[in-house]
């Protein structure tokens, strides 16, 4: 069983670039189509670790979907980000949806 370090709705930072993002989905291992060596220069160990679908903002404040290895992410310690309120809102919305009971007819 593979354990993930981050959860859906959690705010994270790109370790190298410092961008703030929100985890929207998790894959236990790399699960996009098999990349060519030029497209993804990572080893098999990295591909076997969890990968995250993360929404981040580009320099213009527009949302960007990224697919990142666990090793590329770090925990975000702050809960509020006045410079990027949309990331805070997205994280809160996802967490509320995960906690809200689902009514079945």
UniProtKB/Swiss-Prot annotation:
Give GO MF terms, alphabetically.
hemi-methylated DNA-binding; identical protein binding
InterPro entries named among the record's database cross-references: Hemimethylated_DNA-bd_dom, Hemimethylated_DNA-bd_sf, HspQ
Tell whether Cytoplasm is among the UniProt keywords.
yes
Q: Which Pfam families match?
A: YccV-like
Q: What induces it, per record?
A: By heat shock. Transcribed by the sigma-32 subunit of RNA polymerase.
| Top-rank taxon, per record | Bacteria
Keyword Cytoplasm tagged = yes
UniProt keyword list? Cytoplasm, Stress response
Instruction: Give the UniProt entry's GO cellular component terms.
Output: cytoplasm
Q: Where in the cell is it found?
A: Cytoplasm
User: What family is this?
Assistant: Belongs to the HspQ family.
What does this gene product do? Involved in the degradation of certain denaturated proteins, including DnaA, during heat shock stress.
Q: What is this protein called?
A: Heat shock protein HspQ
Task: State the taxonomy lineage.
Answer: Bacteria, Pseudomonadati, Pseudomonadota, Gammaproteobacteria, Enterobacterales
